[in-house]
Amino acid sequence: MDAKALWQRYQEWLYFHEGLGLYLDVSRMRFDDAFVKSLLPKFDKAFADMAELEKGAIANPDENRMVGHYWLRNPDLAPTPEIAQEIVQTLEQIEAFAEKIQTGAIHPPKANRFTDIISIGIGGSALGPQFVAEALAPEFPPLKIHFIDNTDPAGIDKILTHLRNNLASTLVLVISKSGGTPEPRNGMIEVKKAYAGQNLDFAQYAVAITSTGSNLDKVAQAEGWLATFPMYDWVGGRTSEMSSVGLVPAALQGIDVRAMLEGAKEMDDATRVPEVKNNPAALLALSWYYSGNGKGEKDMVVLPYKDSLLLFSRYLQQLVMESLGKEKDLDGKTVYQGIAVYGNKGSTDQHAYVQQLREGVPNFFATLIEVLEDRNGASPEIDPGVTSGDYLSGFLLGTRQALYENQRDSITVTIPQVNARTVGALIALYERTVGLYASLVNINAYHQPGVEAGKKAAAVILDLQTKVVGLLQKEKTALSLEQIAEKIGAADQVEAIYKILRHLQANQRGVVFQGNLGQPSSLKVSIS
């Protein structure tokens, strides 16, 4: 296609949202009109499915739950007055609490005000808040946030060491729907011990974000924590940024949460339009379907050309891959669906993996995120008439052109600036796209059986560890790995037992190996 034809195609397929100043360009996805026409019946069903979901239909049959993250930014859509009222009241409570923390009306026992936050959560309880903090937190926030998003002891130590002199003025958010998820539970216990080590009463620093009646909720109530905010069973982790999960940490950092909600609401309105060409989420879903033949055959590479959007690809990684990565479709057929997502930022990636994107395996499509405003204020000239921002824009446009010239497809999303409204809109845009695409390929976007399988497998390993250690503590002589496995009734778990013991030995847990470490079958094991 020559330059003139491309210009016409660009104009034909350009989507523009005037209120948000957002552009979506899918002209460099090489679908034709016949392809679009062939998908229209599927889109009719997808639009109908989405309308039913927003009305409160059971959209997650595995757990018999509604899916209502859209109600968070427009409570009038909620299926009952009680849900609508709770959404409104929770937002007001979040704003009031944040103001009291920031002004010192609520303050720690040994300081005039809180200066820092430790946010403990995993998955959607971390990725959304991390993305929003990186994108929107002011340079000098009223409280500086730090995340514990894993059960890695060294990672926890790094945060606690960094904050050791500020612990007495550090607020702790514990985010867990059940309170029993191992990663946040472990983080909470370790942080509690750190506070006790400085003779600080953890309850006077702690805030719970959890389901009403959960184990965490009961602990918070019994110990008298500073506050508790709800997590709803109709909001999944990966779509929870507009709930207490995301709004509490954002508000505490001084981010305009109402503007973020308003941006999401505007995008929700735009993505309800039942016409593919006039619905940005439908255009994205169309492009994803085209690129991967409706089977996820190509990866999505996300390149935001703005440092503050660095974590957008990680956020989308969970949203897209956890929603769409499914073995079975809604009819129970094995389909192995999903779209792999990765990325970092432009133009950094042009000096990393863009070489492969341009000339290597064509197993991807690119999503370029463009921000029109370079910075707040004027930019100095680097060359005559040229600024650093001009270079960044040139690199984006150049990458887009270079990819297309070599038959590599791309999508470009353009926003006027990075602010609370546009970030809210981006989140809402991709939430809706995932839902529409899932309908196109006939899968449930709102459950995650693979995650649950991983949790159960981890529990089996920890149970195995307890049995192994218990056996070795009773035995008076060293045993081979095979003997250990036989004695605890786990003859098929020799490799797992070896790896458990190797980890314990490396962490001075009393495990002693005799034999050749390079030949595990030669080892004799005891506990000192």
Swiss-Prot record:
Gene3D superfamilies: Glucose-6-phosphate isomerase like protein, domain 1. Pathway: Carbohydrate biosynthesis; gluconeogenesis; Carbohydrate degradation; glycolysis; D-glyceraldehyde 3-phosphate and glycerone phosphate from D-glucose: step 2/4. GO terms for molecular function: carbohydrate derivative binding; glucose-6-phosphate isomerase activity; monosaccharide binding. It is found in: Cytoplasm. The keyword Transmembrane does not apply. InterPro entries: G6P_Isomerase, Phosphoglucose_isomerase_CS, SIS_dom_sf, SIS_PGI_1, SIS_PGI_2. GO terms for biological process: gluconeogenesis; glucose 6-phosphate metabolic process; glycolytic process. It catalyses: alpha-D-glucose 6-phosphate = beta-D-fructose 6-phosphate. The keyword Cytoplasm applies. GO terms for cellular component: cytosol. The active site is at E322, H351, K455. Catalyzes the reversible isomerization of glucose-6-phosphate to fructose-6-phosphate. This is Glucose-6-phosphate isomerase. It comes from Trichormus variabilis (strain ATCC 29413 / PCC 7937) (Anabaena variabilis). The gene is pgi.
